[in-house]
Amino acid sequence: MKRRTLLALAASTMLLAACGQSTTNEAETNATDSAATGGSDLLQRINNGGTINVGTEGTYPPFTYHDESGKLTGYDVEVTRAVADKLGVDVEFKETQWDAMLAGLDSKRFDMVANQVSLTTPERLAKYDKAMPYSWSGAVVLASTDDNRYSSWEGLKGLRTAQSLSSNYGELAERYGAEIVPVDGMAQAIQLVKQDRADFTMNDNLAVLDYLKKFPDAALEIKLTAPASEQTGSGLVLIKGDDAVVAKLNEAMAALAADGTLTKLSEEFFGADISQQK
């Protein structure tokens, strides 16, 4: 009885080992086939002129929004379309809320995100890759056009700045010795500067350029721009590990920078070139 049991166990063990070896061989074969045909599914679609799926908000002008005709457009959207043209692929945008953007990448609802994502935290850097940046942002000082007191950041000491008390820009202005005039947001800050109740306001260059493009007669201009080392770049973001795809995106983006496409799109949506560090 015991011998039969041992023989049965031995037979079962041999069968399981054979099945396991078969499964391993199949997995190795599939992996080899995948590598031979071009790597990841996304890479194969790019190589074969397929479709890439891109997550974006569609409610965040001037980066991603719907124009008066209902067409999805914006700087990030048009840059992505230009990248797709360079790659020879179609692009399908999948609109989603900002809070669900990276979760959509995780669940493979889309291949990449085009929505002013800069990836600055260690947690995100460990999980996602970012292609070559197509926009750069950093702090700028906005003041009256005829105010010529802004030769350096250190020169802000003693000047009045309209800032939200809880903003990073308020903290930065305080570090340079400026006096904070509290406001609720950028719109109110600009009004105080125009009314001479504050000397300047500080904000992100992209937000300021968007305002100046909409209101060219505001009699305001950017006086100081954060150095390149303090600027952050936003680019197409995808799950970490697809190095070949990132390389192709970088190649396409570099070509768009070289042929002037990024500069042209920047000026169309912002009135200035935001595609390069300055």
Give residue ranges: language-model regions.
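Bacterial lipoprotein signal-peptidase II cleavage site
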Residues: 19-29
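Extended ligand-binding regions for polar small-molecule ligands
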Residues: 20-22, 77-86, 167, 231-272
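Extracytoplasmic small-molecule ligand-binding "clamshell" domains
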Residues: 29-116
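Short loop->beta-strand "edge-of-pocket" segments that line small-molecule binding or catalytic clefts
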Residues: 50-56, 153-166
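Short helix-initiation/N-cap motifs at beta->coil->alpha
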Residues: 77, 93-103, 148, 166-167, ...
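Acidic, polar ligand-binding/catalytic clefts
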Residues: 81, 90-155
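Periplasmic-binding protein-like
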Residues: 135-140, 205, 209-250, 272-278
